[in-house]
């Protein structure tokens, strides 16, 4: 079952993220996860959280898929795909037109229609406004130089909804 995350899920989300931190996901502090809990959806099986993913709104027409993680003991069963499908549904409900993801998992996201992109697909005016954000994910989307060490090897992908 895919459902909205609860604050009580945050320690379990942290455990999932920690499994992949420094490999395919950036490390997340508990406070960061609590601050963003309303963006998260979780996969639950028999009362246990086995996967997570978040949808973060970047701009009026643009969102980002973040922090998709599945318990290694249940990978390959479509759980990650179910989470991303839910995030795509929510993005459409919010009337977002495009979703961005920064990922090593290009084949996985490609199955959901994401395509690799170069550059930052926003106007100069929007770029300048987005630069004011304190969110590190926005800086990664904008490809700002101070986040380059965090994103080396990742692919920038976008899907039009």
Regions found by a protein language model. Give the residues of each.
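Conserved acetyl-CoA-binding loop-helix of GNAT-fold acetyltransferases
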Residues: 70, 76-89, 100-101
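Conserved active-site alpha-helix within GNAT-family acetyltransferase domains
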Residues: 93, 97, 103-131
């Amino acid at each position: 079952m895919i459902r909205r995350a609860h604050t009580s899920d945050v320690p379990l989300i942290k455990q999932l993220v920690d499994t992949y931190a420094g490999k395919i996901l950036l490390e997340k502090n508990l406070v960061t996860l609590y601050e963003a809990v309303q963006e998260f959806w979780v996969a639950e099986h028999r009362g246990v959280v086995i996967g997570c993913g978040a949808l973060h709104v970047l701009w009026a027409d643009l969102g980002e898929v973040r922090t998709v993680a599945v318990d290694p003991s249940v990978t390959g069963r479509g759980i990650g795909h179910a989470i991303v499908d839910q995030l795509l549904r929510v993005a459409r409900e919010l009337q977002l037109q495009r979703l961005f993801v920064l990922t090593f998992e290009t084949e996985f996201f490609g199955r959901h229609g994401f395509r690799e992109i170069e550059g930052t697909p926003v106007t100069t005016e929007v770029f300048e406004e987005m630069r004011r954000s304190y969110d590190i994910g926005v800086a990664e989307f904008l490809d700002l130089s101070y986040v380059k060490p965090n994103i080396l090897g990742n692919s920038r992908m976008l899907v039009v909804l």
